[in-house]
């Protein structure tokens, strides 16, 4: 009787275990899979705080040069200037341009520049649902990983437009949200390399930057090309260097 009772208990335990594994635990297993997938997706990035940043990190006087909308026709020239002056920078690329110019992205990564996520095709994120915003961010990062085997740990919303949803999406992906504190408005040149635009870009960078200890400078290397930005960049670098700034990435 004792052995039969023990056998019955053991059989019941097996049945219950099978039932739990096959049915009751499915949500838990799915949740665990989701956690593992998120961990894999965010591997390599430090934890990100909630909120948006506009000032360069680091002690003392620091400046961060950032380039949006690339890679584009002026990217190669910008890389040459940065290399010549041995200056770090951050590129907030767009997914469609990453797919179109993968070799330039690989050059950016190989040279040690930071990669930022500027969405897949630069929409106004405030007009999109949370799911659509997530797809814009994730699709860009997936393309970046496929092309250069890296993940962007920084995110910049197109046009600087964002709501709380974007901040949460970025934080869950261990991506810091970066805006800017110095706007060169170089995009207004629209492909022109005239001295007027070069001087204007330099003037805005110097006027806005000189009053800040930690400026984040916004420039572009859009597909149409920005020759005025390329011409202004050496002057901007020399200006900040002469005023005691240390160049950093975001």
Predicted region positions:
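Terminal accessory/targeting
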Residues: 1-65, 80-90, 213-250
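Divalent metal-coordination and catalytic microenvironments
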Residues: 68, 82, 91, 115-118, ...
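Active-site-proximal beta-strand/loop segments in catalytic clefts of secreted hydrolases
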Residues: 67-70, 92-96, 119-120, 156-160, ...
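Alpha-helical scaffold elements lining the catalytic groove of polysaccharide deacetylases
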Residues: 123-150, 161-213, 228-231
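Hydrophobic residues in alpha-helical membrane-spanning segments
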Residues: 28, 103, 158-159, 235
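Residue-level detector of anion-binding/catalytic polar loops
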Residues: 88, 114, 176, 183, ...
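Alpha-helical structural signal in soluble globular domains
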Residues: 81-85, 104-107, 111, 143-147, ...
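Active-site beta->alpha N-cap acidic-glycine motif
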Residues: 36-128, 132-152
